[in-house]
Amino acid sequence: MAKNKGVRIVITLECNECRSNPAKRSPGVSRYTTEKNRRNTTERLEIKKFCPHCNKSTPHKEIK
């Protein structure tokens, strides 16, 4: 028999300021990968993490 699909899924977090701000330290968009529990966190995740392109801590939002 096949195993049940897990509750944890892999998501990608992308910097909000990199997409909207063209005048930044270096070109590119900061992305992090992490896991989230589908049962506990049903809405999209937003975490403040360090962005090497902006050179500061910025909010990172979950993308598909």
Swiss-Prot record:
InterPro entries: Ribosomal_bL33, Ribosomal_bL33_CS, Ribosomal_bL33_sf, Ribosomal_zn-bd. One of its GO terms (molecular function) is structural constituent of ribosome. It holds the Pfam family Ribosomal_L33. The keyword Ribosomal protein applies. SUPFAM superfamilies: Zn-binding ribosomal proteins. GO terms for biological process: translation. GO terms for cellular component: cytoplasm; ribonucleoprotein complex; ribosome. Keywords: Ribonucleoprotein, Ribosomal protein. Belongs to the bacterial ribosomal protein bL33 family. This is Large ribosomal subunit protein bL33. It comes from Prochlorococcus marinus (strain MIT 9313). The lineage of its organism: Bacteria, Bacillati, Cyanobacteriota, Cyanophyceae, Synechococcales. The gene is rpmG.
